[in-house]
Structure formats: C-alpha cells, structure tokens
Regions:
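Structural recognition of the beta-strand scaffold that forms the well-ordered cores
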Residues: 25-26, 49, 77-78, 135-137, ...
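Surface-exposed intrinsically disordered loops and tails
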Residues: 105-123, 127, 183-188, 218-235
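Residues that flank catalytic or metal-binding motifs in active/ligand-binding sites
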Residues: 23, 28, 42-44, 72, ...
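Surface-exposed recognition segments
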Residues: 150-151, 155-156, 184-185, 202-285
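A short glycine-rich, aromatic-capped structural motif
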Residues: 15-67, 72-93, 145, 203-204
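Short, well-ordered junction/capping motifs at the entry into regular secondary structure
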Residues: 120-129, 168-203, 266
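Conserved "repeat-terminator" motif of extracellular CCP/Sushi domains
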Residues: 2-8, 90
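Short, well-ordered surface patches within globular domains
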Residues: 32, 71-170, 209
C-alpha cells in the first residue's frame, strides 16, 4: 500500500532529496549491457515499488478487483497492459503527480506520452526522464533493478540468474514450489527473499508488464528498434501489439523466471491467460 511519508536518500541531487511514497525504493542509475543489447545502456535514477501491485492498492484506486486468486496482499492479476497504464495514471492523479500516459484514444489502440511542461509525444519518441507520474518500467530499467543495479555491481552479484539469488527457491514462487500442486495460485508478496535493492518477487509469482512494444520478424524472432534507453517498436497504434513481460510466474518453470528471459503477451487479448500477469510501478525522480 502506498502512503505518504518523507524519507531522504543520500547522494541525490539538491531539490530531489525526498520520497513521498512508502514501499517505493530509490534505485540509483548507471550503465550496463542488457541481456538483449549489443551495447551499454544508461538508466537514470528511479523509484521502484518493493512489490508487484497488490490487490489491496489496486482496489483502492480502481474500485474493482479482477484477480482470479483473491487476497489483499497477493499481486493483482487478470490485468491487461492498457489497464495497467490506466492504473498508473489514476494513482498519479491521487497523489498530485502529472500522469505519464495520454489515454483519451486508448479504445482505438492509440497511446501518447505526457512529458512535463504539457509536452505530448509519441511513444517511440518519449523520454521518461522528463515525466513525473507512476508508470511501467522499460525492459532496460526492469533488468537493471531486478539484477540489483549499481549496488549489485559493487557487491559482485549483478549476474545472479534470478532476482537476488542463483537459487530460485530462495526468491521465487514458480511451478516447482507452487504451480504443480492442486492449489496452485499466486502467493502474498514479500514472502520470499528480496534482491540486493530490497525488491521482492521480481522473479516468479506474476509476470510483470513492461512498457516496450514487441513485433516479430518473418522468422518469428523478436524485432526491436533501438531508441535511446528504450527498445520500442513504432507500431504503437496497434492495440493488440505484443508487449514485453519479465520475471515468470507461479505457473512457469525456472528458465522463465530468470532475469534475462524475455516473455511477451498481447496488450488486450487472451484474457484467460492474464491470471499469470501483474505489474510493478516505477517513477522517475
């Protein structure tokens, strides 16, 4: 649950020294080579929620609970990519932040990005460094914080297979420890070991939607167009275009829960599969 608090972090620039939101963890930016990139990418400072979005806070914001596996502290699931964007905007408005997404034409499958100073740009041109509200992470950002970021680099643990460990059972709910049993379901967040940044459930429990749009080439392989920090295909006006998901879920095997595994799903269709899909919010600071 998000509650307004004041917490200071050392090493942050003057004028940007306070965090107003409980359970939002400061993640220092840096440079690294993502698993899918041929070169280093830069990540700027962000705040990341400790947990996937829970049903409790979703219900408070959206006034409904679509989840198949009910429980206040379980991740919300059965949520589409577009619904996750809507949640981010409503949460931003609740706390007086400028929403990131222009969703007035979302029913047509059209998305625009709202940068600061009332600048509205197409998704492939967006610079999230110039946004204020809550949003989905890019895949570059997701791999950075799931791997432990700069802290893990300094500790020599950045290359863990899973988020926080090479032992999946320490950090993840997945097929072997929950998914293969008759009562298989999501689990309450925060019950497994956190990663180096204090983030929970990046591996397993629910897949996490990322911002990035995915297209396939003629061979059925992922087709990405490089654009600064983002890996964004420019077919942003297609509502059913595939979007990136990361981290695996309660119903997946260990390979799917690895940090560097790349999953995807359609933005609005195949609703029956959405019980595997949740999301985690981030915010530029």
């Amino acid at each position: 649950e998000l509650k307004v608090i004041i917490k200071k972090y050392s090493g942050r620039k003057a004028g940007n020294t306070e965090s107003k939101f409980q359970n939002m963890v400061f993640v220092q930016g840096g440079k690294y080579q993502p698993s899918f990139a041929d070169e280093e990418k830069e990540v700027f400072n962000i705040e990341v929620c400790k947990y996937p979005t829970t049903q409790k806070i979703w219900l408070e914001v959206m006034e409904n609970n679509p989840s198949g596996f009910k429980g206040d502290n379980r991740p919300v699931e059965t949520v589409s990519w577009w619904e996750a964007l809507d949640y981010c905007n409503r949460l931003s408005e609740k706390y007086g932040l400028e929403p990131v997404y222009e969703l007035s034409k979302s029913s047509e499958g059209t998305l625009m990005i709202k940068e600061l100073r009332e600048k509205i740009v197409s998704p492939d041109k967006a610079n999230f460094k110039n946004t204020e509200g809550f949003r989905l992470p890019t895949e570059v950002e997701w791999e950075w914080f799931a791997s432990g970021g700069q802290k893990a680099i300094e500790q020599g643990t950045f290359n863990y297979i899973y988020s926080g460990s090479n032992n999946i059972d320490e950090v993840a709910w997945y097929y072997e420890n929950i998914g293969k049993f008759d009562d298989a379901s999501t689990q309450e967040v925060g019950l497994k070991k956190s990663n180096q940044l204090g983030l929970y459930d990046c591996s397993g429990n629910v897949w996490e939607w990322c911002y990035d749009t995915i297209e396939f080439d003629e061979n059925g392989d992922y087709k990405n167009i490089k654009n600064g920090n983002l890996y964004m295909y420019e077919a942003f006006d297609l509502s059913n275009t595939y979007r990136r998901v990361k981290g695996g879920s309660w119903g997946n095997g260990n390979k799917d829960c690895a940090i560097f595994h790349r999953g995807c799903n359609q933005a609005i269709n195949v609703k029956e599969y959405f019980r595997y899909f949740g999301f985690r919010i981030v915010r530029t600071i």
